[in-house]
Amino acid sequence: MPVDVERRVAEVAADVLGPAVASSDRLEADSLALAELTLALEDRLGVRLADDGAFETLEDAVRAVTAASREARGSSDRLGNGFGRLQWAAHAALGAPIRRAYRLRVEGAYSVPSSGPAVLASNHDSLLDIPCLVVASPRPVWFMAKVELFRGPLAARLFHACGGFPVRRGGRDLSAVRAALEVVRRGRLLGMYPEGTRAAHLQAFLPGAAWLALATGAPLIPVGVSGTAEAMPRGSRVPRRTSVTVRFGEAIDPGKEDDPPARLERARGVTEDLRSAVERLLRQ
């Protein structure tokens, strides 16, 4: 392998993960830190790495960069043609039925900025959470959803046209990270569920939403959704009529953090603040 590539990869890894981690035989870092490393390598070395690439060692990273350097860098448009083109139509189609069926109550919508980017971070109790959040928001919401919902060409096209993009849970999904960054950098609202899965009670939050806010400077808007678990509990296919409330909390604005190690460290503290804010909204 070219010595220059090895040196540059090692320098980037040391900057992002710290000298001790970068110099060890294995890159002992979580999926978010490895995603941070991948994006830093792309930015500084001018390459596009494979979305499904996994770095277990520094040699893995060097091999990935060496292979990527022989390929043209991908398009800056990571969202594809037609992304979100049916959002207003979906909002209009869902609005009246959801408000009627679930007596939808919306509180604190003034917390959502009238323009510019923001990350809406909500608890996740039910499959109804996404449509209820989309209807409650005063602006269109782009959102990431589990890849299983995109099975089949028709479902994939429909979700894409409504502003959804898939995320593979349980590991590093660079395509989802890139899409999320692109949405926020375009000044849009991004909906995220930091618990990572549906649960009857509020679970620990993953740091992705906080990291995204720190990476872009976008504010975090905590959201508490109550009633959807009763309307459509996990495992149910037929929703029941009941009341649903969507509460938007005051914005959490951690500011932009340009230093990768500091960003990773701060993301954990901001995540705790975010979870506490959502918990308070659910108790109201």
Language-model features: where?
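Short glycine/serine/threonine/alanine-rich loop segments
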Residues: P19, V47, R139, G164, ...
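Short, flexible loop segments at the rims of nucleotide/cofactor-binding pockets, characterized by
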Residues: A61, A96-A101, L120-A121, P166-G171, ...
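Short hydrophobic helices that act as membrane-entry/anchoring signals
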Residues: G84-R103, A156, H160-G163
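Phosphopantetheine-dependent thiolation modules in NRPS/PKS and related acyl-activating systems
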Residues: M1-G82
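Catalytic core of membrane glycerolipid acyltransferases/transacylases, capturing the structured
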Residues: S114-G171, A179
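Helix-to-loop junction immediately C-terminal to a conserved catalytic motif
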Residues: L94-H124
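Non-catalytic C-terminal accessory region of glycerolipid acyltransferases
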Residues: L86, S175-Q284
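Short, hinge-like loop/turn segments at secondary-structure boundaries
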Residues: A68-S69, H124, H160-C162, R237-R241
